[in-house]
């Protein structure tokens, strides 16, 4: 991670899904014998990695109909954009993280969600209000976000961020979940 931070200081503190041996030692060795490097700041990161365990949360959750919200309970970006763009949007948030929000409909259609629940990554609640309270976010903003997103699903057009894929079903079937 020292090499990552050397070239991308904005990634300080973020965990990696790489194996422990991926430290850049080979690059450092080659530099010592005179090799040049290019584009070292071009580091691909995944936007949804559980930050305590470095466990990658599959894109299939977002693709199944989940949304991303910030600590205030608001959507802030097109969840289905490319990894680099979604990651950059999350890094730009003051809190540097986002919640993946989904309901029972998404959970039932995505086996990975049950794995995340079993591993303890998921916060669940019987209602959006209870979920917002558990996450320490403003319930009214969160409910407005869900209502607005559900309207986009109904008309199959995201007026806010231009999401054109995975507008599968409204997020309204309890329990509600967050990673």
What is each model feature region?
Residues 11-12, 52-56, 179:
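Intrinsically disordered, low-complexity segments enriched in polar/charged residues with Gly/Pro
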Residues 27-137:
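An anion/pyrophosphate-binding glycine-rich loop and adjacent beta-alpha core
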Residues 1, 30, 142:
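Conserved hydrophobic/aromatic pocket- or pore-lining residues that grip, position, or stack substrates
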Residues 1-8:
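Flavin (primarily FAD) binding-site architecture
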Residues 21-28, 140:
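Short alpha-helical basic/polar micro-motif
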Residues 11, 41-45, 72-79, 152-156, ...:
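Short linear motifs at secondary-structure transitions and domain/linker junctions
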Residues 141-179:
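A glycine-rich dinucleotide-binding beta-alpha-beta segment and adjacent secondary-structure elements
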Residues 10-22:
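A short acidic, glycine-rich active-site loop
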């Amino acid at each position: 991670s020292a090499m990552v931070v050397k070239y991308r200081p904005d990634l300080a503190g973020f965990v990696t899904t790489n194996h422990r041996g991926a430290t850049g030692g080979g690059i450092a060795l080659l530099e010592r014998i005179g090799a040049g490097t290019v584009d070292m700041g071009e580091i691909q990161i995944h936007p949804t990695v559980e930050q305590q365990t470095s466990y990658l949360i599959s894109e299939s959750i977002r693709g199944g109909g989940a949304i991303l919200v910030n600590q205030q309970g608001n959507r802030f970006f097109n969840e289905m954009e490319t990894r680099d763009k979604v990651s950059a949007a999350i890094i730009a948030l003051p809190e540097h993280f986002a919640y993946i929000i989904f309901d029972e409909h998404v959970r039932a259609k995505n086996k990975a969600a049950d794995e995340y629940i079993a591993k303890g990554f998921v916060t669940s609640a019987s209602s959006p209000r209870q979920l917002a309270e558990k996450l320490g976010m403003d319930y009214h903003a969160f409910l407005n976000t869900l209502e607005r997103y559900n309207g986009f699903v109904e008309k199959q057009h995201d007026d806010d961020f231009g999401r054109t894929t995975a507008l599968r079903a409204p997020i309204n079937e309890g329990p509600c979940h967050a990673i």
